Amino acid sequence: MLLIVGLGNPGIEYEKTRHNIGWWVLDLLRTKLTGLNLRLLCYSRVYELKHELKKEVDFIVYPLTYMNNSGKAVKCLYEPRMDLVVIHDDLDLTVGKTRVRFGGSSAGHKGVSSIIDALGTDSFWRVKVGIGRPFSKQEVINYVLGEPQKNEKEVLIRAADYIADQLCLLITDRNFSRFQQNINSFNSNENN
């Protein structure tokens, strides 16, 4: 079973912000899938995707706890037999750069920190989407909670759409090695 979690903040005022890139990916993913059932549980909007042949269910999750408390929602849904995939923004990657990694520190991302703390482990997949850095450290909060410029937004949408396509493949074949390789080699500034 896959537990695919997009990190973001609920509310219309946040939906187009850089910090909500995890939700952008899930929004695009949902347009590519059929047979999703929506449920509200565990402080989240949860879309279930049932696989009749495999007798499995995958979950696409939008935590409604706000970014810094994402661990509360994930802990409520997570079971050890699940493969957890968390999609989030990354200030240390250039705009549109994508990276997949298994385990490791939160690198200062409070949503990821919350999940690590709640689960008591860092053993899960992270899909990072670069949003770049502001010019000044004092601007970080306003930057992540701000909307990207038009050219930035186009690059981020290309990256989010590519990740959504790769998640569709992962849902089908569970090939994490290929998933990681494809996303790590993607360049959102080129036509792939």
Curated annotation (Swiss-Prot):
Positions contributing to tRNA binding: Y14, Y66, N68
Cited SUPFAM superfamilies: Peptidyl-tRNA hydrolase-like
The enzyme's E.C. designation: 3.1.1.29
UniProt enzyme class: hydrolase
Active site location: H19
Reaction catalysis annotation: an N-acyl-L-alpha-aminoacyl-tRNA + H2O = an N-acyl-L-amino acid + a tRNA + H(+)
Coiled-coil annotated spans: none
GO cellular component: cytoplasm
Principal place of residence: cytoplasm
Keywords assigned: Cytoplasm, Hydrolase, RNA-binding, tRNA-binding
Quaternary organization: Monomer.
Job of this protein: Hydrolyzes ribosome-free peptidyl-tRNAs (with 1 or more amino acids incorporated), which drop off the ribosome during protein synthesis, or as a result of ribosome stalling.
Name used for this protein in its record: Peptidyl-tRNA hydrolase
